[in-house]
A protein has these predicted regions:
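N-terminal helical cap/lid subdomain that shapes the substrate entry/recognition surface
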Residues: 1-55, 61-63, 74-76
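A generic helix-loop boundary/linker signal
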Residues: 4-5, 25, 29, 43, ...
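Small/polar loops that bind or transfer phosphate-bearing groups
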Residues: 7, 69-70, 128-129
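Asp-based, Mg2+/Mn2+-dependent phosphohydrolase catalytic module
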Residues: 37, 58-61, 75, 79-180
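Residue-level marker of alpha-helix boundaries and capping positions
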Residues: 47, 69, 123-125
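Residue-level marker of regulatory loop/turn positions in helix-turn-helix DNA-binding domains and
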Residues: 49, 70, 102
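Proline-centered loop/turn at the N-terminus of a beta-strand
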Residues: 66-68, 143
Length: 180
């Protein structure tokens, strides 16, 4: 749990958390490359969905509601992870941090996901566990949901991210989606 809040910032955040090294440190690139190679080899070791997420996805799918993944994680890691979690063939849109040439908080990745799902951004609900997610969703014209159960890497309290909703478990999304 020590590095949980750093995970949202990827290798950069984890290396800073462990060593205090910024990207301009002489050893940063060596450590980053070693970290990413090890991560790639063990992409799904001890990795699981948040409790209640499987049930939420089944409920969305049973109502034919498109869902997808927009992550700043590079495709090199995103697609194998989705395969191993058995989500690759279920996600309507999977967008990695390098899919569209920019990453969140830029709105382009979430707009690409909406395009793939053939939805207007105003019809989308973007759920994220980092302030960058909320900023990206808002910039794209989507309703936003802050997932307090996630990694939440921002220094700003989640209540100050400006999300339309805050949820504490995946099942908290159900009344937001279905209006009940």
């Amino acid at each position: 749990m020590l590095f949980r809040s750093k995970a949202s910032a990827g290798a950069r955040g984890l290396i800073f958390g462990a060593f205090g090294y910024e990207p301009d440190h002489p050893e940063f690139n060596i450590l980053r490359d070693e970290f990413l190679n090890n991560y790639e080899r063990a992409i799904c070791v001890n990795t699981r969905l948040f409790e209640g997420m499987s049930e939420l996805l089944v409920q969305l799918e049973s109502h034919q509601i498109a869902w997808g993944i927009v992550t700043n994680k590079l495709e090199r890691f995103t697609f194998p992870l989705m395969e191993q979690l058995q989500l690759a063939n279920r996600s309507f849109a999977t967008i990695g941090g390098d899919t569209v040439g920019v990453s969140k908080p830029h709105p382009a990745p979430v707009l690409k996901a909406a395009e793939i799902c053939q939805l207007d951004p105003s019809e989308c609900l973007y759920v994220g566990d980092d302030q960058r997610d909320i900023e990206a969703g808002q910039a794209a014209g989507m309703a936003t949901v802050a997932a307090a159960y996630g990694y939440c890497g921002s220094d700003l309290p989640i209540e100050q991210w400006g999300a339309d909703f805050i949820i504490h478990t995946p099942k908290d999304l159900i009344p937001i989606v279905f209006g009940s």
